[in-house]
Each structure stands twice: as structure tokens, then as C-alpha cells.
Amino acid sequence: MKSGMTRLALGTVALLLAASALAEPVADLEGPIGGWRNSKLTNELEQYTAAYPKPPVDRGAQKYRTLIAGRIRAAGKQRRPPVLVVNGNAMPLYGDGEGRFARPWAFGPGSNSVEIVSADGQSRQRLQFYEADTTKTSAKLRAVLTWDDPRAEVDMHVISPIGDHAFWAQPLLSDGGGLDVDSVDGAGPEIFSTAAPRPGVWLFYVNYWGNFNAGGYNFDEKAHDRDLITAQLTLIYNENTPNERREFVTVPLRKIGELALMKSIRF
């Protein structure tokens, strides 16, 4: 009896894996390219790149980042967005009306991966590339803030051990770390990183600032998709190294103007 149940369970698992493998890709991924690469041999990282769709406020673009770009095939037909997973960091993937997207990411040396997963988890596309430029700096501390309402404007605020404050109006810290400037407006995620975090206590806050739509920003309590917004903070230490570790914090947001301390860490 147990043997028969085991065979049945194994058969079910095999069918699920086969269905997942045969599922249509959720997106056409145009970049990055898988395989071996050396940033010193190209000028890609010297070019200015910005997120797309363009956020409500254009804060320009930044250098030294690689574009994760492509097109979501079933744009506008899904209730939930697909998920973009970069080096294990999961975040909602939103596109424009035609499904096009571009997410800049500062990849470090070594093995890197990009994966797009359908909302139901049945389709997975994954590519991997190896960055051979060992002079590139890796983020010793990275924070990724995501939330589940694309019409809500949610902000991350980071306070450094010396009192520096990184947020949407002043995204960079005096010592060089800070928020990606084009991640601070729109549906997110918001990304903070530093290659040399100061020793001491770091504070990470989340603020439900307002909402936005085609007409711009607004403070209408009903102009969003969810009554309860779930914000998740992912903290990555020593990213893409043998010493990498992660922490996850989830906070509910109910009202515009709400401010909450998500995490306090000592580095």
C-alpha cells in the first residue's frame, strides 16, 4: 500500500514538473544575455540606464547598472503581475500598456541569475551569467522594498549610523550609498544599496505617502487597488558571496501618511 502511494506521489510530482516545463514563457526577455561576460570589455555600464515604464516623476538615469529588459506577453490580462527574481530577490514585475519593462540592476562579480515567474507559478524562465570583472564592487548591504498595490506610492527611508537620511527627495548618502534614483517613484520596488556600510545602527522605515494614476499623484483614500497594502522589506548582507544572508520583514499599511519602522540593524 505504501509502495503504491509512493509511486502515485512520484507520478504526480513528475506531471507537475512536466506541466511547468511545458508552460509558455510569461515574458520575452531581451537582456541581460546569459553566459560569460566582462564589463571591462564593453561600455554597457558606462551608459546611463533608467527604469521603464517611466515613473510619474523623471529623476534621470544612472550609470554602472545592467538593464533587465523585455516584454510581458499577457499585458493587462492578468489580475496579478508576474514576479521578477534577481539573484534570489523577488519583486512584482509591472510593465506599460504593451507590457514592456526595464529594470536596472547593479550586478556584482561572479555568478548572477535573473528569473521571471508567472503569477500562478506554472511558468519559469531563468538565465544565468558570470561577471568576470573582479574589480566591480558588490553590495555589502542591500535593501529591497516591495508592495502589492501598483497604484500606491510607498517610500523607503534609510537612516545611517551618522544620521544621514536617504529617501525620495534626497536619495544619496554622503558616503556614496543610497537609493536607485529612478526607483523612488511609482510602483516599485525601491532599492537601497551600499558597498561600504558604516558600522553602527541602521534604521529602515516605510511610509505610505499617497497614490498615483494617469493624472499623477493624489491623496484620495480610495484611489488604490487594496484596502490593506502589504509591504515587504528584504535585507541582503554580503550579496552574491559565500557569506550572503537575508532577512525578511512584512508590514501592513492601511492609511495614507502611515509611517512604520520596519527594521533596525547593527552592522
PLM regions: where:
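N-terminal signal peptide c-region/cleavage motif recognized by signal peptidases
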Residues: 18-20
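Short, compositionally biased P/S/T/A/G/V-rich stretches that sit at domain boundaries
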Residues: 23-62
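Aromatic/hydrophobic beta-strand junction motif of beta-rich domains
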Residues: 66-76
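Short beta-strand segments within Ig-like beta-sandwich modules, predominantly Fibronectin type-III
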Residues: 90-98
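Surface-exposed, short loops/turns at beta-strand junctions within beta-sandwich domains
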Residues: 104-111, 198
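Short, aromatic- and glycine-rich surface loops/edge beta-strands on solvent-exposed regions
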Residues: 109-121, 204
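Edge beta-strands of extracellular beta-sandwich domains
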Residues: 123-133
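Intrinsic-disorder/low-complexity signal
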Residues: 136-267
